[in-house]
Amino acid sequence: MIPKVILYTAVSLDGRTAGFPVDMGLFYSLAQQWGEDASLVGCDTLLNAPDDIPDDRTSEVSTATPSTDDSRPILVVPDSRGRLRSWHYWREQPYWKDFVSLCTQSTPREHIEYLKRKGIKIIKTGTEHVDYRQALEELNGRFGTAVVRVDSGGTLNGVLLRAGLVDEIHILIHPALVGAISPNMFFRDPNPEQAGEIALKFLKSELHSERCLLLSYAVLK
């Protein structure tokens, strides 16, 4: 079974995801309404975090296990190339109860061993690129994940949309125009030459803080 996948993004009025101040308090307070079991966060999103996070070069082994009655979601990060070496930092954050790295058959063996030392769960699908359909099925089977909220940039959003895996899209529009300052769009098609329409059904619109508009759509499949 594939979990319900919710794509939720903060954008400027012209659809950019960077180059303007995001109301983070409002963004994450609204995110609570979907009761996510897993936060699917793009690897680049974590690598580009504003904090100066050093790579973990220690050989320390983590044995921490989540409580069975912990209602927090799990953090899921696709990282087929083994680029994320700051799991020690993300494990210390209070937002998630458990941690999963999505890998492939080509993920470096040394990185797989690093993940095991740090107590990071591993889901391995695909050869060069993560097979997201299979990964979502395994999230449901292994962790009981019913709702996944995607917190990422346009590349991962585009891959999931084109694979037909997204159920709902929620866009929090901020009162700003970015223009040429940022090329980052909330939907970047993985194969523009074969791009086509993705049909949506309007669900609702909500005005928040008298400045931000939340638009909600269902993806027609």
Where are these regions (language model features)?
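Enzymes that bind and transform nitrogen-containing heteroaromatic metabolites
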Residues: 1-221
